[in-house]
Design a protein with these regions (language model features):
Chain A
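Loop/turn segments within WD40 beta-propeller blades
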Residues: 26-32, 72-79, 129-136, 178-189, ...
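Solenoidal tandem-repeat scaffolds enriched in leucines and small polar residues
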Residues: 110, 115-227
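A short helix->beta-strand "capping" segment at the edge of beta-propeller domains
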Residues: 1-20, 54-56, 110-113, 290-296
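WD40-repeat beta-propellers
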Residues: 44-49, 71, 91-96, 128, ...
């Protein structure tokens, strides 16, 4: 009887990005059919799936006057729209213009027009994200000087017009943000999580005060929008995260009563945020406790700073990447425990030099590392 | 992804569920990396830096690496298995629903057999393909065959032990059948020898192995027939063994005797055999001696033949038959331990699964079958059927029953996996839908993101979404279709999909686009649609306005000027016209004002005048003056006519 | 003999299935077209018994013709030639060898991007054929009349509909009827150049698509249309106004309809809800005089009075296509299977 467990489980495909500098972000569109990349070379590129597993470059343009940090897609209900943010202190909204007799169209190139340039920030804009579509066409940016800005396009047909709805100062450098994707507006008010990469000095810690919350050394803040006061307020600060944060991401809600937030800091963390019922929460001095937060997982396997955390579509797998030049996949088991299910590494196998890169678009099978301890049985 | 198993501490602790490490090709990432998820199981790894200060980089660090899971079930042959088993799975869910009110075990058994026949057909297809294939392709197919042989074997045993209705729970006949079916060792030789029916068959090199094999498989009659073909078959020694085989008591629930009574006659028969053996009459025939020892359930005899078989399953049936034929189906653990212990070789994965099954440790069985690389097909379907049969109980460390959670998690994962496939998505959806509420929430996320390249696909997605009452998905697909038509400037398609999605915002957007198109090109798009649309026109004010405006065009074209004029006035006075459309609306009055017969009453004319003054900014001076003049002239002639009283029924 | 149903899994969702007519012997071969897969194709199959002595026949693939996009319609232009519409906007005429069906299909004509949104792709959603002529429709709302003999576009009705067209049927050589995504039906004189329909009416008030249209084999003025809602509508085109009779039939969209070629009273329908029904339509075609002396037709209000039979237990997935030849019916479904139903009484 042969071996029942397979050794080849993954296939890989290399794409030459052809950016002239470091790539900072890769974002897929709603359908996973288009991919946008941005880089320190100040360019943004859009790649389209050719339907046969390959990717074709369909647009490439100089988008900013500085490194482009992040790129993100709007919901397709609003058309083909992306937003970028940059070291040049701006964020920009781009729209693809439908098939025209433009010069590049024969070559399969498409035109993206800058519809709006958001210039309110005085420092580098570190992250940009479109809001959940049921809130309308919303955009949030954050900047190195710690200001969160929420913009709205009142007329979705007119992407040139964005009004700055809210400006929320946080007093610490903000590196990343994530919208809570919960669709239930009744149960969950609009919610944002932001992460700070402020180094841990005593000064910084002391300065993190204000609002109505008490001093908190945490690096992740939760903001919620109140319909009644029409304001965004900081409703929590996750004291469990004390180290600078590089990335955060809410998992899809799937109708749960709680939210899961992945945090990339000195380790990979998964934090369960459970809203506490109004009646039980209201204190007498107005300082209410909104959430019960619990670190459900903290993984130090990267042995280094973690840069990125990213959920798959259904929130069942979390990918993380760190300074160890490895990507790890974490999966929730049926009893809600999380464990690592795969590691992707660059380490060359001794005595076996991997094939040189070829700019092809077919998938090739990947071999598992020749390490007997990784195989369950033989 | 099915690379994992659950993390509950396994009682055996045999397996180390370490994550697998994969080596990225190309050595392309020297520094930091980032990652981004695409659709389904695809994600991208890219080189990434957090440093603000630009550092010169080598362009070698400039590759994206797309990684995707390799899914065996997506190969064409296995897609048949996926589709066919989906039908059986859905029937099983119905049967389980029915089982809530009445016992439905017979139906479950029928469905379990159906699953096995699906596996059998799949194996036949794989063998047929493997016979034709070459190279890597052949190797792959052979490894699939190995996988599905094991699955068939385990499923069958599971069916015997947990699903089948066995009279008195006496498992032996079923166990023998299982051994014969899956480990048909020596069967061919036996058939050959019996077919030839020649005296002196012992010349065949496998003669004795075959005879012993038949005994071990419990085919006593075949063994006796073979013994008769021996050239010394008529000798006393042979007759003695034949007699012992013939007189062996066979236990049957319907035999009318109790286990106790049976045990007495069995013991008696064994004593007889023992005395024959100790009388040393068989000393000249060591093979016959071996057979006698085997039928007496002698451990060392079994041990001595163990090496002739590839696995201990081959001798399991014989061992039970000759040591404890009255065993009930949940009393096989000891027999399994005895047989497995006869030879100290490395354990195979199948060994572990069969052992766990015979010991009744279903938790461990499921844990083990999750390691099979069939993308969870087997674990999902087997767990589901055992769950519905009420045979599966799994406790967590707090002794809470988590069986349904285990079942759900497997189905959810399998369903999501299939939903990634271009064609199998509808199969995946039916799995997710059978697992509410989370299944439907997941289905919602995936379904909404299904790439839609044709309207036929959109309509199919909407039909499926409606089937499972995922109205939000249906509406979202419509709105996205609307947006796509809008950005391409196709007003008809945009209006149609906005109305189909009953979306107020989208229909208002589409209507604005149509009106804007008219102001620029003087052609009103989608008139066929607007003139036949029903209550959907009420979705938004703009759409309603557009519809009425279109009707105004129709009336004007058919030269029903009076009606056209009335409609136009009502559009002007209703004030739902968008700002940019006032110019058009006001100028549309001009030809009607200039018509031979006055069509606006004086009141109408006043209304238009009022609007013109209120909205003077929408018209440039020259046009406004022209309109004022026409209005004044019309006022003059209508006032005259109305004053005469010749004006017939104004409204 | 009772109905015999036999399913075969083919690893492709089948969008269209068609018997290949034979002259003197029982039909054995058929076409399938697939959809919604990474690689779609048109296949030729034959029915054969793997073992001589066995009665059971299984489909065996004879040839495969790969196409881009989904196969949206297959209709015969001649005995051995089919017109195929594809979701990439192409229309092809393919020929199967009369003598050796195993021989690969030969391409006779190929209209690339016949339906299009300029540079962007647009689905050719269906076509109909009549005496060698082909009428095609697309999501672009255009109608094209092609000659299947000369391979040329004879006439185009640009913007026949502002929405996408989903079904088409030749009423006569010079007249076609189209149905759009909203159930808006239009009749076109293909000789006319004014791009205006000669008549237009709605399938139902629900604004759902007209998924298929056929006419009665012996009374071509009787038109039947299937709706996305599962309803079936009948018109008598001799009437000036178009009184329609609408039956709520299937629980989801009607995917294909066919009158039995040998018995015009038998109608077969299949649906997205996985049902395959036979209808006794005898009553429908018996016209009677109404109270005002006008020719009335049988209202289809009650489908029970129509004698509807379900031929197979409903599948869990959509049945997309059916084709009947004497006592045998072929079905293609979204569960990646084809079904052969034998001993059908007609």
């Amino acid at each position: 009887m042969g071996e029942l467990t397979a050794t080849n489980l993954f296939e890989s495909q290399t794409i030459l990005a052809d950016h002239k500098d470091l790539i900072h972000d890769v974002a897929y569109d709603f359908y996973g059919e288009r991919m946008a990349t941005c880089s320190s070379d100040q360019y943004v590129k859009v790649w389209d799936s050719d339907g046969n597993g390959g990717w074709r470059l369909t647009a490439s343009w100089k988008a900013h006057h500085g490194s482009v940090w992040k790129v993100t897609w709007a919901h397709p209900e609003f058309g083909q729209v992306i937003a970028t943010c940059s070291f040049d202190r701006t964020a920009a909204i781009w729209e693809e213009v439908g098939d025209t007799a433009a010069s590049g169209s024969e070559k399969g190139l498409r035109t993206w027009l800058k519809r709006s340039n958001l210039v309110d920030s005085r420092t580098s804009v570190t992250d940009v994200k479109f809001g959940p579509k049921h809130l309308g066409l919303l955009l949030v940016t954050c900047s190195a000087d710690g200001i969160i800005r929420i913009y709205e396009a009142p007329d979705v047909m007119n992407l040139a017009q964005w009004t700055l709805q809210h400006e929320i100062p946080t007093k610490v450098s903000i590196s990343c943000l994530s919208w809570n994707p919960s669709l239930s507006r009744v149960v969950h008010p609009p919610m944002l999580a932001v992460g700070s990469d402020e180094p841990n000095t005593t000064n910084a810690a002391a300065s993190v005060q204000g609002d109505k919350t008490t001093a908190c050394n945490g690096k992740v803040f939760i903001y919620e929008y109140s319909e009644s006061s029409r304001r965004w307020t900081r409703t929590d600060c996750l004291s469990s995260v004390q180290e600078p944060v590089n990335d955060i991401a809410f998992a899809p809600n799937l109708g749960r009563s709680f939210h899961l937030l992945a945090v990339a800091t000195k380790d990979v963390r998964i934090i369960k945020i459970e809203p506490i019922a109004e009646s039980a929460a209201s204190g007498n001095n107005g300082a209410t406790v909104r959430f019960k937060c619990e670190v459900v997982a903290a993984f130090e396997e990267h042995y280094s700073c973690v840069w990125r955390v990213c959920w798959n579509l259904t929130g069942t797998l979390l990918a993380s990447s760190g300074d160890d030049c490895a990507v790890r996949l974490w999966k929730m088991q049926y009893l809600n425990q999380w464990k690592c299910v795969a590691v992707f590494k660059n380490e060359p196998v001794p005595g076996d030099s991997p094939p040189q890169s070829r700019p092809h678009t077919t998938y090739i099978r990947m071999a598992t590392m020749a390490n007997p301890t990784h195989m369950p049985f033989h | 992804m099915n690379t994992s198993s659950f993390a509950v501490d396994s009682s055996r602790g045999k397996t180390v569920d370490a994550a697998k490490t994969f080596v990225l090709p190309d050595k392309c990432f020297q520094k930091h990396v980032g990652c981004a998820w695409g659709r389904g199981n695809k994600f991208t790894i890219y080189p990434r830096s957090q440093t603000v200060n630009k550092t010169p980089t080598d362009t070698a660090d400039n590759k994206l690496l797309n990684i995707k899971q390799d899914i065996l079930l997506f190969t064409p042959i296995l897609r048949k298995l996926v589709n066919e088993s989906n039908g059986t799975y859905l029937s099983l869910q119905k049967a389980a629903e029915a089982a809530k009110v009445s016992d439905n075990q017979v139906e479950f058994l029928k469905l379990s057999r159906q699953f096995r026949s699906i596996i059998r057909v799949c194996l036949e297809n794989l063998q047929e393909a493997a016979a034709k294939a070459e190279g890597i392709e052949k190797n792959n197919l052979l490894s699939y065959i190995t996988i599905f042989y094991s699955i068939e074997c385990i499923w069958h045993l599971c069916e015997i032990l947990y699903i089948d209705n066995i009279p008195g729970d006496i498992v032996l006949p079923y166990l023998l059948e299982w051994v014969r079916f899956h480990f048909p060792c020596h069967e061919q030789t036996a058939a050959q020898l019996l077919g030839a029916c020649e005296r002196g068959s012992e010349d065949h090199e496998d003669y004795w192995d075959t005879v012993v094999g038949m005994v071990v498989q419990g085919r006593v009659d075949v063994a006796r027939a073979l013994l008769k073909l021996h050239s010394a078959g008529e000798s006393n020694e042979f007759k003695l063994v034949d007699n012992s085989l013939r007189s062996m008591p066979v236990y049957s629930v319907y035999g009318g005797i109790s286990t106790g009574e049976f045990t007495i006659s069995w013991k008696h028969w064994q004593a007889e055999c023992r005395s024959k053996l100790s009388s040393r009459v068989l000393a000249s025939q060591p093979k016959l001696e071996l057979i006698m020892k085997i039928i007496m359930g002698d451990y060392s005899a079994f041990e001595s033949i163990r090496s002739k078989y590839s696995s201990w399953f081959d001798i399991l049936g014989g061992w039970v038959m000759f040591t404890a034929p009255w065993s009930r189906r949940h009393e096989l653990g000891a027999a399994a331990a005895a047989c497995a212990g006869m030879q100290a070789t490395g354990r195979s994965h199948l060994d572990d699964m069969v052992r766990a099954l015979l010991e009744g440790d279903l938790h461990q069985v499921i844990h083990e079958i999750q390691q099979i690389s069939d993308n969870g097909w087997f674990a999902t379907h087997l767990t589901d059927i055992l769950f519905h049969c009420g045979k599966l109980t799994i406790m967590d460390k707090h002794q809470t029953n988590v069986t349904s959670r285990l079942r759900d998690s497997l189905i959810l994962e399998y369903g999501c996996l299939l939903m990634e496939h271009k064609s199998l998505w509808s199969v995946g959806l039916s799995y997710l839908a059978s697992c509410p509420p989370e299944g439907l929430r997941r289905a919602e996320l995936i379904l909404e993101r299904m790439p839609v390249d044709t309207e036929a696909k959109a309509m199919k997605i909407i039909a499926e979404a409606k089937k499972y009452e995922l109205i939000g998905v249906a509406q979202s697909v419509c709105r996205c279709m609307c947006a796509r038509h809008l950005s391409a400037g196709r007003a008809g398609g945009a209006l149609c999909w906005a109305m189909r999605g009953r979306s107020s915002a989208a229909s208002s957007r589409a209507a604005h686009a149509a009106l804007a198109h008219y102001t620029q090109h003087a052609v009103l798009p989608a008139q066929d649609l607007l003139l036949t649309a029903g209550s959907a026109m009420l979705l938004s004010d703009t759409l309603l306005f557009l519809g009425k405006y279109c009707d105004f065009h129709r009336l004007y074209k058919t030269r029903e000027f009076k009606k056209a004029a009335q409609l136009l006035v009502s559009l002007i006075t209703s004030k739902i016209a968008p700002e940019y459309f006032w110019e058009t609306l006001l100028l549309d009055t001009l030809p009607l004002l200039e018509s031979d017969e006055p069509v606006f009453t004086s009141n109408d004319t006043y209304e238009i005048m009022l609007c013109l003054e209120l909205r003077s900014s929408s018209l440039d001076g020259e046009k406004a003056d022209l309109l004022r003049l026409a209005l004044a002239r019309n006022l003059a002639r209508t006032a005259l006519a109305e004053g005469d009283g010749t004006e017939e029924g104004a409204q | 003999m009772p109905l015999e149903v036999q399913g075969t899994f083919v690893s492709q969702k089948i969008s269209k299935i068609r018997w290949i007519a034979e002259d003197y012997v029982e039909t054995k071969c058929f076409f399938t077209g697939s959809w919604d897969d990474d690689q779609n194709s048109i296949k030729v199959w034959t029915l054969e018994s793997p073992h001589e002595e066995e009665e059971v026949e299984y489909p065996r693939q004879l040839s495969e013709y790969l196409v881009d996009g989904d196969v949206t319609q297959i209709k015969f232009t001649e005995k051995n030639k089919i017109a195929v519409s594809l979701s990439n906007g192409d229309v092809r005429v393919l020929e199967v060898s009369l003598y050796d069906k195993q021989f690969p299909l030969k391409e006779v004509f190929h209209w690339k991007k016949l339906h299009n949104y300029g540079a962007e792709q647009c689905s050719c959603t269906s076509l109909d054929t009549l005496e060698g002529d082909i009428a095609t429709i697309g999501e672009d709302g255009n109608v094209n009349i092609l000659s299947g003999r000369r391979g040329e576009v004879m006439h185009t009705i640009k913007g026949a509909d502002s929405c996408s067209l989903h079904s088409i049927c030749f009423i006569k050589h010079t007249e076609v009827i189209t149905g759009n995504v909203r159930g808006h039906m239009k009749i076109w004189d293909v000789r006319s150049t004014n791009n205006k329909p000669s008549a237009a009416f709605l399938l139902a008030g629900d604004e759902l698509a007209a998924t298929c249209i056929i006419h009665h084999p012996t009374q071509p003025h009787i038109i039947l249309a299937g709706s996305e809602s599962g309803a079936l509508a009948v018109w008598d085109l001799r009437m000036n106004s178009f009184p329609t009779s609408l039956v709520n039939a299937h629980s989801a969209g009607v995917s294909e309809m066919q009158f039995h070629p040998e018995n015009p009273h038998k109608l077969l329908t299949c649906s997205v809800s996985g049902e395959l029904w036979e209808w006794n339509m005898e009553a429908m075609t018996k016209s009677s005089k109404g109270p005002d002396g006008q020719v009335m037709w049988m209202p289809l209000q009650d489908k029970k009075s129509m004698m509807v039979n379900s031929l197979i237990p409903a599948l869990h997935k959509s049945i997309n296509s059916l084709h009947c030849d004497k006592g045998r019916i072929l079905c293609g479904a979204d569960n990646e299977a084809i079904y052969l139903i034998k001993n059908f009484k007609y």
